[in-house]
């Protein structure tokens, strides 16, 4: 970074703060630790820290912890001295580029790697630590399979105890034990993943691990009491929003053409798509419940809304159940089926734009909570007219399908439940049943031209495919009762869709969509004409 002019010639802004000093301060007296150090973390939270550093509101960087994909540390953090290049893709085609020096250190959270494990403990012992944030995806908090039994790796972590853990939740519980036994300083654990009541989800999983270890005699009762005491260990709720697609090869090539070296994206062994740069949209929202018993950075100066739990909950419900995520989940699978690689291209399809508007403005807006700090209508307008059509983002429909089964309850089930509460059933809904049928049709992995394609990674999709294994593309009569076990599953949808009055309707749409080549388009057109 010493040759500032070369960077400026390439149109890249550099930090005005002393990067080495900031990293050193972060390592010596950490205030902020983050788990799950991929793209959204680097550009959004790393970006907030970068802004705070530029404003002089903080003086140290974030400690970055990876529990799942260690390639990220080896291929992206270490070789580039923990620097990250932010590339903001504006809707008008302009690009804002900046090097960020806000990431102080990257640690592999491996209990079988003595040096890394000791270092992580050292960080958690330090009373200077105020907050630990998380972007580990919703499945990172899950301890149990859909049937309620523990995953095998969680069972192992319970039986092996705090010193031999492998999963994110067990690692966090183990680090809280280290903090408890070394002064029990207060701390705030902040889930920033895109799921409802994320703080409650994190708290529940960490407490479960603590209680299971207590039963096995690994920990003391006072430790469990510490983890449960929100005046000492807080779990604030949050709402986060910034569309961050996979790194674009085109941007990598443009950066290399401007004089930078080794900018190409890598795909890790765990299928993480990552690069030395992060490309994302400009708009972003982070709403955090202000519950920090050990103090916190002045996050407001980085554009964060600090508020109470009720407001966070409303903002999160607005986004996740109405304005943004349901539209992604409604359109992503159909985009793949209709041959649209890019989501913004699908938004130019008149039929699909109508589906998006029906899901948001009509079906969702009727039951949306208003958080007060952000207008739902203005937020949805920004999504439909500015964010989603931003072709420069290059957001793919396949990315929108990743782990989509985990979000069906939040993104559709909550609204369906609100209709049942309001009207006795959800039969008024038209676009949401169409969306659910489209997701099921997508899981067959045959597009509307009859060509097979590879599904995005998703933990439940294999189970769904097994239940649909006797459904034959081109033969609507092959659908008998295969969908019943899925559509009645409250673990997936939060509600039995037959009891809500729309299970049969979804079956009917799905039956039409498997009729053969072109059936998906024909079916969408038929139902859109009824909106």
Locations of regions flagged by a protein language model:
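Substrate/ligand-engaging "lid" and interaction regions
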Residues: 1-531
């Amino acid at each position: 970074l010493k040759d500032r002019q070369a960077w400026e010639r390439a149109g890249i802004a550099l930090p005005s703060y002393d990067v080495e000093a900031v990293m050193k301060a972060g390592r010596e007296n950490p205030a902020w630790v983050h788990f799950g150090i991929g793209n959204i973390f680097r550009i959004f939270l790393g970006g907030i820290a970068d802004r705070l550093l530029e404003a002089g509101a903080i003086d140290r960087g974030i400690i970055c912890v990876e529990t799942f994909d260690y390639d990220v540390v080896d291929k992206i953090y270490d070789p580039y001295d923990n620097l990250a290049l932010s590339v903001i893709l504006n809707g008008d085609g302009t690009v804002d580029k900046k090097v960020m020096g806000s990431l102080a250190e990257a640690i592999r959270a491996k209990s079988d790697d003595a040096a890394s494990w000791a270092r992580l403990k050292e960080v958690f012992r330090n009373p200077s630590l105020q907050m630990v944030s998380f972007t580990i995806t919703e499945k990172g908090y899950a301890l149990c399979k859909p049937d309620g039994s523990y995953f095998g790796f969680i069972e192992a972590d319970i039986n092996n105890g705090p010193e031999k853990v492998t999963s994110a939740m067990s690692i966090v519980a183990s680090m809280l034990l280290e903090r408890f036994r070394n002064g029990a300083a207060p701390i705030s654990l902040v889930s920033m993943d895109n799921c409802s009541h994320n703080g409650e989800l994190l708290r529940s999983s960490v407490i479960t691990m603590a209680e299971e270890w207590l039963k096995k005699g690994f920990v003391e009762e006072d430790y469990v009491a510490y983890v449960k005491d929100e005046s000492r260990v807080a779990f604030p709720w949050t709402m986060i929003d910034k569309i961050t697609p996979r790194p674009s090869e085109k941007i990598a090539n443009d950066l290399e053409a401007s004089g930078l070296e080794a900018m190409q994206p890598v795909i890790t062994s765990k299928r993480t798509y990552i690069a030395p740069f992060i490309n994302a949209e400009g708009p972003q929202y982070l709403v955090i419940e202000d519950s920090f018993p050990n103090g916190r950075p002045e996050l407001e100066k980085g554009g964060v809304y600090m508020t109470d739990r009720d407001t966070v909950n409303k903002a999160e419900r607005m986004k996740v159940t109405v304005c943004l995520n349901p539209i992604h989940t409604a359109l992503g699978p159909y985009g793949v089926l209709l041959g649209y690689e890019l989501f913004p291209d699908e938004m130019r399809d008149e039929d699909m734009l109508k589906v998006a508007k029906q899901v948001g403005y009509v079906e969702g807006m009727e039951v949306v909570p208003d958080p007060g700090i952000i207008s739902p209508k203005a937020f949805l307008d920004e999504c439909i007219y500015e964010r989603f059509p931003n072709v420069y983002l290059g957001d793919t429909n396949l990315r929108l399908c990743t782990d989509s089964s985990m979000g069906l309850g939040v993104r559709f089930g909550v609204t369906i439940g609100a209709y049942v509460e309001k009207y006795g059933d959800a039969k008024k809904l038209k676009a949401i049943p169409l969306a659910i049928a489209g997701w099921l049709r997508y899981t067959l992995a045959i597009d509307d031209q009859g060509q097979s394609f590879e599904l995005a990674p998703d933990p439940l999709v294999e189970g769904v495919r097994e239940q649909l294994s006797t459904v034959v593309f081109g033969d609507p009569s092959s659908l008998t009762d295969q969908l019943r076990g899925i559509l009645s599953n409250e673990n997936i949808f939060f509600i039995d869709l037959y009891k809500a009055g729309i299970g049969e309707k979804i079956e009917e749409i799905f039956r039409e969509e498997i009729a053969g080549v072109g059936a998906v388009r024909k079916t969408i057109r038929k139902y859109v004409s009824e909106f």
